[in-house]
């Protein structure tokens, strides 16, 4: 799975990437790739990813994100609590749900 996290460019999303990578390794999730990018990068890079999740700090851009990726692309918002505590299990569950797994 290739998961793109969209944020405002803060350090917290980089920490979340590390938690997701650690969770993937501990649970035998192979071929996992995750990166964090700012919202303005989305139009140029989203097609290279399986799923795009955005943090609560950029949820005001949700309409822009949906318009950018189109109606059928797997796109979702990470819940504020899951984002704040780095709940990798719930974030993976969200990604899998969006991917139809």
Located regions from the model:
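Ser/Thr/Gly-rich flexible loops in soluble cytosolic domains mediating phosphotransfer, phosphorylation
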Residues: 74-101
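Cofactor-cradling patches in redox/metallo enzymes
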Residues: 24, 32, 44-49, 54-74, ...
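Conserved active-site segments centered on acidic
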Residues: 2-40
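Conserved short-loop catalytic and cofactor-binding motifs
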Residues: 4, 8, 53, 79
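A general structural signal for well-ordered alpha-helical segments in protein cores
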Residues: 13, 17, 62, 88-91
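Generic hydrophobic alpha-helical segments
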Residues: 42, 65, 91-95
């Amino acid at each position: 799975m290739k998961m793109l996290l969209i944020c405002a460019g803060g350090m917290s999303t980089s920490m979340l990437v590390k938690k997701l990578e650690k969770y993937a390794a501990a649970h035998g999730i192979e071929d996992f790739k995750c990166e964090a990018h700012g919202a303005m990068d989305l139009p140029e890079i989203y097609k290279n990813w399986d799923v795009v999740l955005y943090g609560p700090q950029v949820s005001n851009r949700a309409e822009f994100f949906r318009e950018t990726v189109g109606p059928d692309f797997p796109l979702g918002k990470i819940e504020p609590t899951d984002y704040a505590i780095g709940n990798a299990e719930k974030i993976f569950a969200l990604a899998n749900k969006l991917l139809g797994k």
